[in-house]
Swiss-Prot record:
CDD domains for this protein: Rab1_Ypt1 (cd01869)
Keyword Transport: no
Originating organism: Dictyostelium discoideum (Social amoeba)
PANTHER family: RAS-RELATED PROTEIN RAB (PTHR47977)
Keywords: Cell membrane, GTP-binding, Lipoprotein, Membrane, Nucleotide-binding, Prenylation
Entry-linked InterPro entries: P-loop_NTPase, Rab, Small_GTP-bd, Small_GTPase
Domain of life according to the entry: Eukaryota
Name of the coding gene: rab1A
Region Disordered: start-end pairs: 180-202
Membrane topology, record value: Lipid-anchor
List of residues binding GTP: 15-23, 33-40, 63-67, 121-124, 151-153
The name this protein goes by in its record: Ras-related protein Rab-1A
Family the UniProt entry places it in: Belongs to the small GTPase superfamily. Rab family.
Localization per Swiss-Prot or TrEMBL: Cell membrane
Length: 202
């Protein structure tokens, strides 16, 4: 039986508590937004299927808690991730400064070749913005990772952020698979096996 998708990508949303990770996930997966803030406890995930260059891609997006006390819980979810979106709040400089710490978490727990994306959320709060776009862009460029500013509230660049990540992952996997050789740790065309949170590197 043929699966209803060509690829299954596991994505993670990480970053300090309160930067809007859950809001980004809800906006992308369900096209909803809530002003009320409830901290994520541990992890949660949603699935959305997209079309990209004629291929059907199922995105399994994990929303992780930003609080320190959940780090040991969420660290296991880095393994097997194809892409990780690091989110900060453009109105909170500390959350941007802590991006380096989150990147260290990725280096420690995730696969070496995992795709990364830097996202500055809450771009609609122009009057409260303290992290300059060019500063964040220069930082991302120095790490050779894509960067976007988003607004989950206004749905600005949210779709583009996840599509950018999916495109980057697909390009990497396609480039690393010139043949149809199946690697159990990679998601290849026609693969219907679900991704385990404890699976190996991709």
């Amino acid at each position: 039986m043929n699966p209803d998708y060509h690829y299954l990508f596991k994505l993670l949303l990480i970053g300090d508590s309160g930067v809007g990770k859950s809001c980004l996930l809800l906006r992308f997966a369900d096209d909803t937004y809530s002003e009320s803030f409830i901290s994520t406890i541990g992890v949660d995930f949603k699935i959305r299927t997209i079309e990209l260059n004629g291929k059907t891609i199922k995105l399994q997006i994990w929303d992780t808690a930003g609080q320190e006390r959940f780090r040991t819980i969420t660290s296991s979810y880095y393994r097997g991730a194809h892409g990780i979106i690091v989110v900060y709040d453009v109105t909170d400089k500390l959350t941007f400064e802590n991006v380096r710490q989150w990147l260290q978490e990725i280096d420690r727990f995730a696969c070496e070749n995992v795709n990364k994306l830097l996202v500055g959320n809450k771009s609609d709060l122009v009057a409260k913005k303290v992290v300059d776009f060019n500063t964040a862009k220069a930082f991302a460029d120095s790490l050779q990772i894509p960067f976007l500013e988003t607004s989950a509230k206004q749905s600005t660049n949210v779709e583009q952020a996840f599509m950018t990540m999916a495109t980057e992952i697909k390009n990497r996997l396609t480039a690393s698979q010139p043949t149809q050789t199946v690697d159990k740790n990679k998601v290849v065309p026609g693969s219907s096996a679900p991704i385990s949170p404890k699976s190996g590197c991709c």
